[in-house]
Amino acid sequence: MSDAALIIEEDTPLVEERIERIYGTVYAMSSPNAVHQHIFIKLAHQLDSFFDGKPCTPYAAPFDLYPLANAGDTETVVQPDIFVVCDKERLKIDGYYGPPPLVIEILSQNRSHDLVTKLNLYHQAGVEEYVVIDPLDKIVMVLTYGEGAYRYNAYSFSDKIPSHRFEGLFFDLSFPLPF
């Protein structure tokens, strides 16, 4: 006999609602568009290849990140597009508890959420490198944490974009987009 429960269709949404909770405020997350997904899958593959056989591992949304867990806040939870885990002690079956060294967000509909709200959260948590990809303007912003603030570098999609945290890692966004 199956453990699956019978679900009444009219009572159940087709897709599970995804949310992020930052400092007690809940944010609904919409489904990513085709361009976002195209970039996402290409970058996930690049990071998976780069970290193969190395001590760090990339994780992709939807997977929970509790960036302020070190400070005792396990209520704040986000689902970055991609983040890299190096401290396996913080990795649990249900998420990662603490700031990862690298977070990547691909901008979609709610640009200010990634550019303001999550930037401030990642800064407070001590995320070392925050990469924001803007498919609309074809710009990549690499923010590297040091001396209490983020240092900002901007690149175009045609540039060879270096990670400032992981030597030898480059983000290649020179591939054609579907739209």
Regions found by a protein language model. Give the residues of each.
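Gly/Pro/Ser/Thr-rich low-complexity, intrinsically disordered segments predominantly at protein N-termini
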Residues: 1-179
